[in-house]
């Protein structure tokens, strides 16, 4: 009986590993957009933090360079937060019901 339980646990662990890999692959394809300056600067990135595009409204190009740099940084940070929230939501569905310690995130 113990051998059967161990085999079942190993099968569950393998299925979980496969599901995590699939979720990670899906996250690499999901794109989120961060914005700043009421949408004047936008950063499009995947949930794996690969930046795909930065869009800057032409009206900002004649403005202060420091302000533009701040807006780009703010849009990037907004995109990172959105990617993290999307990743957490996606992975949370996989780990629902698992006895993980508080604050522990998957993948490790």
From Swiss-Prot:
Cytoplasm listed as a keyword? yes
List the taxonomic lineage. Bacteria, Pseudomonadati, Pseudomonadota, Betaproteobacteria, Burkholderiales
Organism superkingdom: Bacteria
- What name does UniProt use for this protein? Nucleoid-associated protein Mpe_A2533
Q: Which GO terms describe its cellular component?
A: bacterial nucleoid; cytosol
DNA-binding recorded as keyword: yes
Subcellular localization(s) per the UniProt record: Cytoplasm, Nucleoid
Record note on quaternary structure: Homodimer.
Q: Where is this region: Disordered?
A: 86-108
Please state which protein family the record places this protein in: Belongs to the YbaB/EbfC family.
Q: Which GO terms describe its molecular function?
A: DNA binding
Function of the protein: Binds to DNA and alters its conformation. May be involved in regulation of gene expression, nucleoid organization and DNA protection.
Q: Where do Pro residues bias regions lie?
A: 99-108
The protein's matches in Pfam families, at most eight in alphabetical order, are given as: YbaB_DNA_bd (PF02575)
Keyword set for this entry? Cytoplasm, DNA-binding
